[in-house]
Amino acid sequence: MSTQSPNHHEDITKTSSVNMTTTTTTTKTKAAAKAGTNAAPKQKTQMHRRSRTGCYTCRLRRKKCDEGSPMCTACKHLGLCCEYKRPMWWSNNDARRKQKDEIKMIIKRKKLSEKSSHTIQTSINTPPGLSHSLPTSATFSDPLDRNRSASIDSHFGFNFNSPQHGQDFAAFATPQIHVNGEYMFPPFSPYEIDMKTERQIFINDIPTLRESTVSTFSTYQTPPPPGTILPSFPLEGEWTEQVFSERRESLTEETFNANFFDFACDPAMASSQVAIELDDGDQKLLDHFVQHVLPTIFPILESNQHGSISSELVLPSLANNKGYLHCCLSIAAQHFKSTMGIQNEEIDNDIMRHRYATITWLCEALNRDENHQPILDATLGLIFFQCIVGRPEDTLPDIPWHQHFQAVVSLVQKLDLAGLVSDITKPLAHTPFNMTLTSWIDILGATMLGSSPLFAHTYRNKHLSINNHSLGLRELMGCEDRVMYLISEIACLESLKNQGMDDITLCQHVRGLGDEISNTEVNEGTLVEPYNANGTLSPKQLSKNITAAFRLAARIYLCSLVPGFYPAQPSCMGLVEKLTAVLQLIPSGVNGYDRSLTWVYLIGGSVSVPGSSFRDFFENRVAQLGDVANSGSFGRMTVLLREVWLQYEAILAAAEAAAGTSSLSSETPQQQQQVNAHYVRWREVMQIKGWDYLLI
């Protein structure tokens, strides 16, 4: 591979600082009464986590929703209808505008009613800081919905806002409650504050990635006068059953353990200044990488965490790992070229310059044979990032992914990562992230080559382990670890078949692996859309749906090894229809997870026959992705599937022409057998076309 030296033109270098900051600005304060002149200084406000999953009423009003159950604080305070399920008016602009006008009228009438009926003189003091605000109906809201980083193993520490002890429950059983307003509530006027929260990544003090939201905080209405008798509170009935049901569902929701992985770097560095020396051209590439590539790297991991795991993982390495930096800049140039549709020599030079610099750095580092962790990071980046960017028509020279993976295997062995995760006597507190990523590439990459995974023995031991079976694959890419281990076993069986295993032994192994796949379905229950009752994404249910899709794809892959297999078999067609039904439960579109199921679409689509519902469903999902569907592994898989279908239909057309009819119904058994024996296999198409893809 030859290209110009990175120093072929004069570099104008400068220090690039990558910084992630969060700022909060109070934009508006509303009070029911004028504050006193001798007001105390406001105390520091408590930040709220950003939420994209509030009720549709708050979304329409563009207000912060605390996701209270059964009603959020804002809707309860204003007497509005709180809807967590998508309402009919949401999908129509006119209906949405009408609904917004109705909400305004309701709020206006409520304010006028409060003003006319407000005859009680209340104390006029300066409102305290938010840290002294009273609990609202958010007492019943789910803290897990707002903080997905709660530990998966933690049984304690959940914030229920107003914890009660056993001796306190008697207060709720009294039929009447005598309230002293001065005792229960501090004597201040109710108020509302809108807070604008911004989260930015700065490079050279220039904002690149920016997230902004406006949140509203409201206190209770004015407390009743002393001596007021409140009506008894019904503790039984439909409302309390609904609250209990929703809380039980949210509390049993399994959340991602943020400390599950060992990222081999300090995540705290992601929030501090990261100094990088770059010239002006490379600075633009880095900006593009941070803005457009970084958020798409690990969508399943991000959905579990509701945070910025990719930033915590990647940004520190950019400053400390020169090979990794060149790799990311090359990927950024490749992504910029494909998304912007640019075809010129300058962008190609940027791609090849940084690609060459990465390979040069890796060769020098491997020759030194020291400090293996940064080398492993950069090598895995060369492999995995290609699954996110680029297009099938890319013609620039590159090293095949499986040659890079040979270096990965050597580095994993030197770091003894496979031994660390397999040692049952000393279980690790944190799974090495690079071992999890390596396993993902190893297992599905083996199916690309028709060979055994290089760490198949490790996966076999993990599968048989009772207490130490997880490698973190479910957390990283969505599929349960044991199902991935079985895909590894199927790849091993295919390798043995290619080496000449007899048909009887092959069928025995196929039956045994089929039973093992069935064992992973025990207690799975019915699959549903991955959303909670309040409309938030359920990571646990999403994982179940993704696992079910991989499980069906694994069955199809296993059945394809049976001698005499062909796609038009009723059993195969039935599996493809089941797979289509499961894929309908995966969120679609640019913000969905279809691109995380590239391998599943490949296996299922490659055996779908003309007229199958899978093909129409697949084309619909591609259309929903838009131009994004043409990039990365998903784009390459789409081109491969369409080529497989084209060649398969050509075989059918040739068979019809030979039979002298437009239908296969009158074909002789010999002609039908000939068509079945020559159905197009996706790996053969890749070999014919010279495609060396890693489709994960």
From Swiss-Prot:
- Signal sequence, renumbered to the chain: none
Q: Does the keyword Lipid metabolism apply?
A: no
Membrane spanning segments where? Answer: none
Q: Which is an annotated GO molecular function term of this record?
A: DNA-binding transcription factor activity, RNA polymerase II-specific
Keywords in UniProt for this one? DNA-binding, Metal-binding, Nucleus, Transcription, Transcription regulation, Zinc
UniProt biased composition (Low complexity): 21-40
| Cellular component terms per the entry's GO annotation | nucleus
Compositional bias annotation for Polar residues? 118-140
Q: Where in the cell is it found?
A: Nucleus
Q: Where is the major localization of this protein?
A: nucleus
SUPFAM superfamilies reported for this sequence: Zn2/Cys6 DNA-binding domain
Residue range(s) of DNA binding per entry:
55-82
Q: Which residues form a coiled coil?
A: none
Q: In UniProt terms, what function does this protein have?
A: May be involved in fruiting body development.
Tell me which PANTHER family the record gives.
Answer: TRANSCRIPTIONAL ACTIVATOR PROTEIN UGA3, ZN(2)-C6 FUNGAL-TYPE DOMAIN-CONTAINING PROTEIN
Protein name, please?
Transcriptional regulatory protein pro1
* Native source organism of the sequence: Neurospora crassa (strain ATCC 24698 / 74-OR23-1A / CBS 708.71 / DSM 1257 / FGSC 987)
